[in-house]
Amino acid sequence: MVRTPSKAKRDRVVVIGTGHVGSSYAFALMNQGVAKELVIIDIDQEKASGDVMDLNHGQAFAPSVTSIWHGNYEDCKEADVVCISAGANQKPGETRLDLLEKNVIIFKEVVDAVMASGFNGIFLVATNPVDLLTQATQVFSGLPKKRVIGSGTTLDTARLRFMLGEYFQISAKHVHAYVVGEHGDSALPLWSTATIGNVPLSQYLLRNRAYKKADLDDIFTNVRDAAYEIIHKKGATYYGIAMSLVRITKALLKNEHAVMTVSTFLNGEFGAKEVCIAVPAIVNRNGVREVLELKLNDIERQQFTESVQMLKGTYKTIMQTGHSF
């Protein structure tokens, strides 16, 4: 039986997994006053309890009061959003597929426990590989596809806009460009639809000869490899993705109908079906309201198709290992 969305507006967010990403997400949620209630769940209960104490001690400096506590899966019943940031870390010598196999098993246990509570809200997936784990979460939960969302390429898109803003010396808020596809090496920028203000990027380059089209490829290479560089320098990425997750959460709780490149299921859009992948989508309190199907040029369409095929191939491989994915 498919559950219908709850009409209650408790603005309760449950964070499952408070490693670097989960704890940074909780911290950013409180700092921005997005949620009224924040529940922390982690297999390491001492760590979760410590995070709650640390966060609560900063309540006097937050823009609004957030009720924060160390909870359990029963607290998911009244949650509007459950964010899963739990999972195994990739070890030296492990492949992406090795990591996926471990995290699928973890996610099955987590999602089953959440659903057993009577959860009736929206799943927000942060753990990598996020597109495939978002798909797994939907299968395990049985929730409507629009109510299971992954962080997708929201951070990649933010990185692209930041770097383009630096290059053109324009506020990143007025650079409109998307990164779509897998959150990973097969992601691609949509240069053909990018604009500076309301001016198409291609026209802006023609009007400003100081900027070179060839530089765009270097900029995207830096976007694509940013996570690797940050991991090399500090061991992990967590501030940027935490802020991306908060932005998605705000769109969900505040019913913003905001456009973001989240991981969601396609049903013919962009020529793809039965795959969870990052594309521009309208996000509101019910999850993904609509996928915005942009017109891609031939090169972009080919790259997007390759990204889809890569994800589907990995999906098939996991299916063959015996996981009910």
From Swiss-Prot:
One Pfam entry name: Ldh_1_N
Keyword presence, Disulfide bond: no
Regulation: Allosterically activated by fructose 1,6-bisphosphate (FBP).
Entry's Gene Ontology cellular component terms: cytoplasm
InterPro entries the record matches: L-lactate/malate_DH, L-lactate_DH, L-lactate_DH_AS, Lactate/malate_DH_C, Lactate/malate_DH_N, Lactate_DH/Glyco_Ohase_4_C, NAD(P)-bd_dom_sf
Catalytic activity reported: (S)-lactate + NAD(+) = pyruvate + NADH + H(+)
Subunit structure: Homotetramer.
Protein known as: L-lactate dehydrogenase
